[in-house]
Structures are given as C-alpha cells and as structure tokens.
Amino acid sequence: YVDADASTKPEAFAELIKKIGESDGVIASRKIRGATLVKKEPFLQRFGSRGFNLLARAMFGLPFSDTQCGAKLFTRKAIEAVLPELGITEFAFDVDLLYRLTKKGFKILELPTTWEHKAGAKFNFAQRFWKLIPNMFMSLCRLRLLYSPLKDVVRAYDLTIGKLKRR
C-alpha cells in the first residue's frame, strides 16, 4: 500500500516492487542511509514521528527505522498469515502489522526511499499536535496490552479511552 498523498513517488514504489522477490515484505524508509527527502516534514511532525518510532521500537523490539512511512509492500502469503489477527487501527496499525509479521518469522526489508512532504495534505500535524501525541501513545499502549498477559484488560481500557475521547 502507499499513502494517498503521493509523498512516495511511483518511481520509488517501483523500487519496492523490484525487491519483493527477495523477501516477504518491503517497507520504504525516510530514516536510513540512502533516503532522499525532497522536502522534509515540519519540525513538530518530525519530532512526533521520531518519538513514536523510538517508542514503538522499544515496546515491540522492532528493528525498523521508519515504521510509519506510507509505502509498504507484502506478499499475499504474509498478509494472509496475519490479517485475521490484526487488532489495531489508527496510528499503531503499521506497528501491529510489522510486529505480527516479524513474530511469525517473515523477512521484511527496509529500503531507502525518495520522499516529499506534502504541505497541502489534509492531515495537518501542527494543528493537531497536542491531541495526536496522546492518541499515538495510547495506540501503542493498547497494542502492547494486546500482546501481553494483560490482554483481557484491553476491553476495560477501550471503554475508558472511549469515554475520554467523547469528552
């Protein structure tokens, strides 16, 4: 899949397609050596993205430098193996997907990409920063609970978060 804002150009996505034969999945990265950022994200978005990635890596032991880049490609076999088990939407969807795939032993390559921040994108991180950061953090916490002995707590957790969001 690729994000609809076209931050990852079709040519860069084509590079992922070329490599899918070597693995079960290929993800684009803006953070590794060889990546080209035509136009960087604004500071707050970079800060939030980096913090989210570091927290996701620490909480789930993921080896990827950029879990949130919106260009990923997986084999049908890999997706079919984990799709019924995925429990997260919102911000931690990518983390959930990558975590499930790595736990099942699927090989995922992370490749540098050419990426351009789209200033006109409908999602304005700066305007939503103080609302997004807690939601991003809570998405990771919920996912961590799903993969812990405390997974039964998730229902109560979901009810609590639902009440907080309605306020």
Tell where the protein language model's regions lie, with residue ranges.
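Residue-level signature of catalytic and energy-coupling elements of molecular machines
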Residues: 5, 26, 75, 101, ...
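Acceptor/aglycone-binding surface of glycosyltransferases and processive sugar-polymer synthases
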Residues: 10-91, 118-137
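Conserved residues at the C-terminal ends of beta-strands
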Residues: 2, 29, 114
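Short beta-strand-to-loop acidic/aromatic patch adjacent to the donor-nucleotide binding site
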Residues: 1-7
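Hydrophobic helical membrane-anchoring modules
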Residues: 15, 61, 85-167
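General alpha-helical segment detector with a strong preference for membrane-spanning helices
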Residues: 7-9, 33, 98-100
